Regions:
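Conserved donor nucleotide-binding strand/loop of the catalytic core
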Residues: 32-35, 46-78
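Hydrophobic helical membrane-anchoring modules
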Residues: 1-5, 10, 16, 20, ...
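Short, acidic, metal-binding catalytic loop of nucleotide-sugar glycosyltransferases
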Residues: 23-31
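Acidic helix N-cap motif at the loop->helix transition within catalytic regions
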Residues: 16-20, 43-51
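Acceptor/aglycone-binding surface of glycosyltransferases and processive sugar-polymer synthases
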Residues: 62-78, 83, 96-173, 199-219
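Conserved sequence signature across two-component system core domains
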Residues: 11, 37-39, 62
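A conserved acidic beta->alpha catalytic loop
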Residues: 38-47, 91
Length: 232
């Protein structure tokens, strides 16, 4: 199969991590196209990306922070790869997993990094680990899904998946739960491979600046689950 690959990166205040993430992607994926969608970061993220000398780098700057879902859709529209992936901009250390993910696509439509299969682990603090597991298990129960880590958000897929499943361009991380659910429902073959969610990105996490914010986002995740069931 062709190995023309695009990785989409959504950024907001990632000045300290984006250069490392892009460098790691270049290191581990040959001739990869990167699409960076920045939501008007005030910290210098955009300037940092513009200084990176790499020919297959597309940069889009949005005037407002419109969320991960619409950033992903914008990245899809402007991608050229027949394999498309998503990686959090502060998780460059996980770029090392992409060669394995690419090889697994020979027998799958989507390859997903998972904390909840054998060999996977979540090394963040106990509150985050328990809360994430609770939301994930609730999602599996409501959606009757066999996917072990619906909220991972780190994946590669064949472009043909988009013929059956179009992401809904609203929301933040919960959009990916709905996307994976619909892809599974359409019969796409989804393989999960283990990864260890590292500790060192925790302070930069957008989904958990504090427990209250995390619980609020959890509510929107659950609301999105029921919307996914009834949305055509």
């Amino acid at each position: 199969m062709s190995k023309n690959i695009t990785i989409i990166l959504s950024t907001h205040n990632e000045e300290l991590s984006i250069d490392h993430t892009i460098s790691e992607l270049i290191k581990h994926i040959k001739d990869v196209e990167k699409v960076v969608v920045d939501d008007n970061s005030p910290d210098g993220t955009l300037e940092t990306v513009k200084k990176i000398n790499y020919p297959k780098l597309k940069i889009f700057n949005r005037e407002k922070n419109k969320g991960l879902a619409s950033a992903f859709l914008l990245g899809l529209i402007n991608s050229s790869g027949d394999i498309i992936g998503w990686l959090d901009s502060n998780m460059g250390s996980l770029a090392i997993k992409f060669p394995e993910m690419i090889s697994k696509l020979d027998n799958a439509d989507i390859v997903l990094l998972s904390r909840y299969v054998s060999g996977g682990r979540d090394d963040r603090n106990i509150i985050r680990v328990v809360a994430s597991r609770l939301i994930n298990n609730l999602a599996k129960f409501i959606l009757r899904s066999k996917i072990q880590d619906l909220s991972s958000g780190i994946f590669l897929m064949k472009r043909k998946v988009l013929l059956d499943v179009v992401p809904v361009a609203s929301g933040h991380g919960e959009f990916m739960v709905e996307f994976l659910y619909k892809a599974e429902k359409k019969g796409n073959n989804i393989i999960e491979i283990p990864y260890v969610h590292p500790v060192d990105i925790e302070e930069n996490s957008k989904s958990f600046p504090n427990l209250g914010r995390f619980l609020l986002l959890g509510f929107f995740y659950i609301l999105r689950l029921f919307q996914a069931i009834f949305r055509r």
